[in-house]
């Protein structure tokens, strides 16, 4: 066994990524439909928008997103350290434990059991399970690095490792609650401190899970798929440390023009602006890795996913710092522009790099050279791309329109529009958003079929670890 890599747990998480992707995005499409046609709530409490939205966000971040990070980090750390995972049993525990977390979320959130904190809704017993699984994950990951046969720690592992450590810190500090019952707890913090800790957590969920984690994928799977070395290894190290040091400070930009002290808001804004540099450093490094291999984009849809994801990453990491500027935030905050920004990052960057990486993994986990159908991968790419563009464009227009309508005043100082008029004006954009989301979901369904056909009737191949020659 020690002569082989552990592909079993990688395959399990890869399948989970695809399945939960379909589920999480389906819930997203349902609530998008509810915003356009409210009757789809069916007057059933557990199908109401307020309960399904946290199910959607938890489903796509924790079920789809983190399952993808588990699969890729377990694969990359083995391949770059040339050693089997630290513990098969602990690795198996992280898989089943994480699925238990997801299933308990699917049960409790529609029942209305929530801590009421964005991305930290899950009640305290589930939060403790998350912490236990996460510690096991850290032991497996860092244990593998300690046992490595290659002296150098490849940069992708720095990103995965940074994400694992940061999430531990964030989850524990924001999870400090006083349980009242098994299903109800109260935050240890109150007022403005509670809000600040929540958005320190919330923004760094974006910064470390949805950014650092996926940059780990960029630095392994893009060079592998393109057959080219990383454009600048030095830049990869510099932008790793720059991201790590600046992201932690950016949280207050979620609380502009609130009761948060003004100096804290300004500090958050400054660090958000600084973040543009390391973010774009990473984006440029990834895209320049294609130097001399651009022709491959014509024939390789997996590479298309990866490169377009970097383009969306560049766009979202320009838009984010821009929206953190107070004057712009005064217009954008509380509008659907925020939703457009999130989904540029989530659908365009996180979704595409995950799909590209999983498409890279699946044939290797089935002992094949390619996916069952490359044409279907290409179809998925185009359907999803059109879906993302429709979604983001609709929400951008709606968001700016809402911001302008809310601040419009008559000469006598009264508001020009009632709130409900702005809601009515948004209706057509909600329909377009629903259409875009449906296309994106359709792409995910195509991926699920292709995954099934690729893995069907095939066992995990025995992947022998290369023997290093003693120098």
Give residue spans per PLM region:
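Active-site-proximal inter-transmembrane loops
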Residues: 188-197, 332, 337-339
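Alpha-helical transmembrane bundle and helix-membrane interface signal
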Residues: 148-149, 228
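Long, amphipathic alpha-helical stalk/connector segments used for oligomerization, subunit docking
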Residues: 297-299, 303
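Membrane-interface helix termini and inter-helical loops of multi-pass transporters
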Residues: 43, 115-118, 258-261, 329-333
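Hydrophobic cores of alpha-helical transmembrane segments in multi-pass integral membrane proteins
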Residues: 11-39, 43-113, 124-145, 157-182, ...
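Short, highly charged, low-complexity non-transmembrane loops/tails of multi-pass membrane proteins
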Residues: 459-471
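Surface-exposed loop and adjacent secondary-structure segments within mature catalytic domains
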Residues: 121, 185-190
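Cytosolic juxtamembrane amphipathic/interface segments immediately preceding
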Residues: 1-12
